[in-house]
Amino acid sequence: MSLDPLFRPKSIAVVGASRNREKIGNIILRNLIATYRGKIYPVNNKAEEIEGMKSYKTLKEIPGDVDLAIISVPRQFAVEVMEDAVEKGVKASIVITSGFREVGDEGAKLEEELISTAKKGGIRVLGPNTMGLISPDFNGTFAYANVQRGEIALVVQSGGIGAYMLDWAQRTRTGISFLVSMGNQADVKEYEVIDYLSRDPETRAIFVYLEGVADGEKFLDVVPDAASRKPVVFIKGGATAKGAEAVKTHTGSLAGSYEVFKAAIKTVGGIFVEDLSDFLNLTRFVTSSEPIKGDILVVTNSGGHGVLTSDAISRSGLNMVDIPDRIKDELRKILPVTSLPKNPLDLSGDAGRDRYAEAMKIVQDLDCTKLVIVQSLPVVSCSEVAKVLLNYKGKGVVGVMMGVDEDSALRILESASIPAFNFPEAAVRAIRYLTSKPNPRKKIRVAQPISSAVELTKGKEYLADYEALKLMEIYGIKTPKWGIVQSEEEAQRVADSIGYPVVMKISADKPLHKTEMKGVVMNVEKDMVKSVYKQLSQITKRVMIQEQLTGLEVFVGGLKDPVFGHTVLVGSGGIYVEVLKNVSYGISPVYEDEALEMLKESKVHDMLTARKRGYDEGSLIRTIVTVSRMIVDLNIKEMDINPLIVNENGAFAVDVRILF
């Protein structure tokens, strides 16, 4: 059913409207009276009139149609009210009431009953445990806020975060199209709201704060289309163990893995930020028409700010644009002899409005972002330069205003939709987020397991180490030469056939921490084989002998995330996977270009290219792609290849652990 009755209702009933002005039901009613031009119906079984309006004892007594019912009653009455809504033919409902899934099993059962009742009448429910929904046309929340009409939609899974964003929007004069507080997402899910807003002609960008995702598969299916229509920016609560625990008691959501969430946002083409200030700063870009690029020219009247900004640009992986000689020649004509025509372009501390104007005229056609920093000084004010920048709208201008009149300068630029900041580092981070936006991808998960792989893994909770190596070979992943032995003579024969030196290690049906058990011996030569076998066979009767390879040790793994499903992991291998923690995540299945990006993100690509030998990165990429499909094909719960040794001959799975 359409979400129009929720977002654009023709009539609204407030169930639980109160005569007490401190009660939520009264606040919502007064907010609607102040902002909504449609029909409003207060519902209270003990009142005849509230806030000068006729009150009805139940929804069923209302004479006209009701598009939207906002319910703010004690939770024990919520189901009864929803039954009335079904009988009345209400189309949508916002359930403000809390005390449902977020407080435990009893609340969860009540929430299920509430939603099953609503479904009988085809009622779409926002919440429960929500602050509500607000737009320039109606305030269906208990927040005291009148929003300015704008093009940014805010979707939040926290009433407190939502209230702060409303305050921020008013304080910064930021217009919004909608703010939606999702609450427990018992019915209407975040992906549905994102999809609806992506089709809304009054919304240019969507900003989303989430603590958990209701349905990972649906999210991965729906949000790529939304992100292809307009920017969708995400921030997530529950990044740490403590934060994830707080999420459970806040909205009853499963926080899931923070790193997997980030990978999911990359997959759907969203922009992911890690702190609230950057999240809100991006609003200054997404509604701007400025063509923002990752190549940056810094124009400033402060050498120190130029240095700090250059550092920030370098740390962000962005580029400082080279100034062409012809433009340098023009700049020399306006610069003092103490200033050089280079990037950052220091106009000197005595630069006034005119020097800024002359410099901007010269550099305006450079194909880059012009990051213009103004430190307010006696010879120049931020506001004066802000007015200069208005002449270069559409030329990729970003203003950074620093000084006593920075607020008025920011207002001048913002009124013209030119991105404006009061710190250059914040501007640089916003540029990085915007220019590194990934392309949306839809993940098609069709299990196509190889029959021999199915036979090998059927009915098992885990694979023995030698079975895991066989599975690698079935899927075309290289392994070192190897063999399993159970006697000294067999060990000698297998080692001779492999060639020296070899690695000898304990082997068992269950996955073992072999190194911790002192069950791995490297650099075994011919005359050592029998004695090493005797040593290892004291731990396990079965011993594995492998060809000893040299190369870069890489970690490739997989897991089944409870929210987003199968995910592939890449990072430094051996002991360094725990020490460096430079692991990149990708939602399965990944494609070769995504695998390469994962290698770059985890720094494994840099490690490979730093080697003098031509290590086979292509083989590693193909292995990552294969693993990402294997874990889907066989529904693998956990998988580690550590190490996967990469050298000039390919990528070789040395130790493999697989759990189902």
What are these regions (language model features)?
Residues 1-660:
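Catalytic-core regions of core metabolic enzymes
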